[in-house]
């Protein structure tokens, strides 16, 4: 058996086609949504991600604002840029590209963002609203992951879902999202303290691998026919690798490639959050 490809690039194109129409409708009312990025330092991967985000904006007609700062920027200088974006009406939403250099307090930076302009959905207030199931910008990677499963008909209602990884950007929030009534999944969150990971994954209908450990999920750990999302990214010998070993494709029923799976949707839902806020401000 060869797994169905959960094609994030295909679905991204569909989302962007919808967003282009929505942005055009906003422009007819004289409103142009704006996405800003704050990038600190010279990390090549971060620069690549930010470049792609601005290219996405250009494609669908969203204004983009770049704030590139040196690696030795102080906490106060970074706060000043964040305060500027908080007060800039042309900026509908923005992100601070993570990770930040070690001398900066990441949590304090995220807290400084205006929760209403939090395009990443990672502000403590918005994560708290997710716990309470109140409307707020949703974290982009979990939202993209769940939407990708839905797009290709993977059943979530009543499904046993195993999430590998307990990070703030994916593992923790995706568990909250999957246990909402709209998804209704039973979720097991696995991590370095899990005693028998293979036993957990072999019982799963859906596996979301977000550990950042290259090829750590192998075919013998997957139930035949299960759906697998390869979310984690790591670098080995200069190559980017996902968490899912290639042999999983011979056992699983559906697998997201990496790259080309969840990644394009993370970017799509970032722009989606900005467009959605612009519509809300416009009363649409």
Curated annotation (Swiss-Prot):
Involved pathway(s): One-carbon metabolism; tetrahydrofolate interconversion
GO molecular-function term, one example from the UniProt record: methenyltetrahydrofolate cyclohydrolase activity
Keyword set includes Magnesium: no
InterPro entries, per database record: Aminoacid_DH-like_N_sf (IPR046346), NAD(P)-bd_dom_sf (IPR036291), THF_DH/CycHdrlase (IPR000672), THF_DH/CycHdrlase_cat_dom (IPR020630), THF_DH/CycHdrlase_NAD-bd_dom (IPR020631)
UniProt keyword annotations, A-Z: Amino-acid biosynthesis, Histidine biosynthesis, Hydrolase, Methionine biosynthesis, Multifunctional enzyme, NADP, One-carbon metabolism, Oxidoreductase, Purine biosynthesis
Catalytic activity: (6R)-5,10-methylene-5,6,7,8-tetrahydrofolate + NADP(+) = (6R)-5,10-methenyltetrahydrofolate + NADPH; (6R)-5,10-methenyltetrahydrofolate + H2O = (6R)-10-formyltetrahydrofolate + H(+)
GO biological process, one term: methionine biosynthetic process
Pfam families linked to this entry: THF_DHG_CYH, THF_DHG_CYH_C
EC number: 1.5.1.5, 3.5.4.9
CDD domains: NAD_bind_m-THF_DH_Cyclohyd
GO cellular component: a single term: cytosol
Domain of life assignment: Bacteria
Binding positions (NADP(+)): 165-167, 192, 233
Function description: Catalyzes the oxidation of 5,10-methylenetetrahydrofolate to 5,10-methenyltetrahydrofolate and then the hydrolysis of 5,10-methenyltetrahydrofolate to 10-formyltetrahydrofolate.
Protein family per UniProt: Belongs to the tetrahydrofolate dehydrogenase/cyclohydrolase family.
Oligomeric and partner information: Homodimer.
The name this protein goes by in its record: Bifunctional protein FolD
Species assigned in the record: Corynebacterium glutamicum (strain ATCC 13032 / DSM 20300 / JCM 1318 / BCRC 11384 / CCUG 27702 / LMG 3730 / NBRC 12168 / NCIMB 10025 / NRRL B-2784 / 534)
